[in-house]
């Protein structure tokens, strides 16, 4: 069985496309916090371990998604939780979020021993200019190096990529797709940039008069009415079409399919092949 758990609600980073601070900062100004200070709280390792123990012993849970926006951040906190999982003998398969610039060498083996089988990384874009414009600052060399050490410890990787950030053009989006294909993560998510209400990008879109969806369905990544942001160089329809073609390119890549069959087996390979046989219906794709 599977369950979610939380260890560190909130996020200390300021990526402008993200709306996570909308719920976590709610009411904090009344408590005296500055608007510029993002909300991020640590639950004690003992509390987290007690929750995980309860899930295992009472409910028979073996698969846990740590639903934090950023679990792998503070080495002392993460290492204490990982050490406790090992000491308590909790037989878990764990999925969690990380950033390429937060995974310290001291964490990797501890994460693997504790049962962390998947880490999801927000790589977002290959262009440092595009990333810097949305306050996502790291270089491609760090991306490659971090993923190598994580996968070297036996932890599988989900790469998350965004097409259509404000500085994107066809060339930079192709660079992002090329990086995704090169990294060949065990799974990948391809998103269009959306100005989600509550995000700094939403406020920027309002201020600059960028077109926004007329209904909540337009904010859905996979809906017929999905309407991403245009960029300084591309229409929303062009971004949407590129994203959908990038999905097909990645998941039909022979190198990726060979890796899936080798790591996960023929049944999973068949599921991936079946997935790419279905194209999303889009109203606004150019």
What residues fall within each predicted segment?
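Radical SAM [4Fe-4S] cluster-binding motif and immediate context
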Residues: 1-158, 178
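Residues in well-ordered alpha-helical elements
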Residues: 46, 141, 170-174, 237-240
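Short linear capping/connector segments at secondary-structure termini
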Residues: 67, 162, 260-264
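Short glycine/threonine-rich loop-to-helix capping motif typified by GTGT followed
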Residues: 74-81, 171-173, 268-271
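Conserved strand-turn element in the central/C-terminal portion of the radical SAM core barrel
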Residues: 99, 126-134, 147-173, 191-197, ...
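Catalytic cores of alpha/beta
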Residues: 107-108, 167-182
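Radical SAM enzyme core and accessory elements
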Residues: 200-207, 211-286
């Amino acid at each position: 069985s599977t369950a979610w758990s939380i260890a560190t609600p909130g996020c200390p980073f300021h990526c402008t496309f993200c709306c996570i601070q909308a719920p976590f900062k709610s009411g904090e100004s009344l408590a005296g916090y500055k608007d510029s200070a993002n909300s991020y709280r640590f639950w004690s390792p003992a509390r987290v371990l007690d929750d995980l123990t309860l899930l295992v012993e009472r409910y028979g849970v073996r698969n846990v998604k740590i639903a934090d926006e950023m679990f792998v951040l503070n080495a002392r906190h993460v290492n204490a939780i990982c050490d406790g999982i090992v000491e308590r003998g909790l037989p878990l398969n764990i999925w969690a979020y990380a950033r390429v610039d937060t995974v310290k060498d001291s964490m990797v083996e501890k994460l693997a021993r504790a049962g962390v089988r998947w880490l999801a990384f927000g790589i977002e874009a290959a262009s440092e200019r595009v990333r810097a414009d949305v306050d996502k600052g790291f270089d491609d060399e760090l991306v490659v190096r971090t993923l190598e050490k994580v996968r070297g410890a036996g932890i599988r990787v989900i790469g998350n990529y965004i097409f259509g950030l404000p500085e994107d053009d066809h060339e930079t989006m192709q660079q992002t797709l090329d990086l995704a294909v090169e990294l060949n993560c065990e799974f990948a998510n391809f998103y269009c940039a959306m100005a989600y209400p509550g995000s700094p990008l939403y406020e920027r879109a309002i201020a600059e008069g960028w077109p926004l969806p007329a209904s909540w369905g337009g904010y859905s990544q996979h809906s017929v009415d999905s309407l991403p942001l245009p960029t300084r160089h591309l229409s929303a329809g062009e971004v949407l079409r590129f994203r959908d073609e990038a999905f097909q390119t990645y998941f039909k890549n022979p190198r990726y399919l060979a890796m899936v069959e080798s790591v996960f087996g023929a049944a999973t390979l068949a599921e991936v092949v079946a997935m790419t046989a279905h194209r999303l219906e889009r109203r606004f794709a150019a």
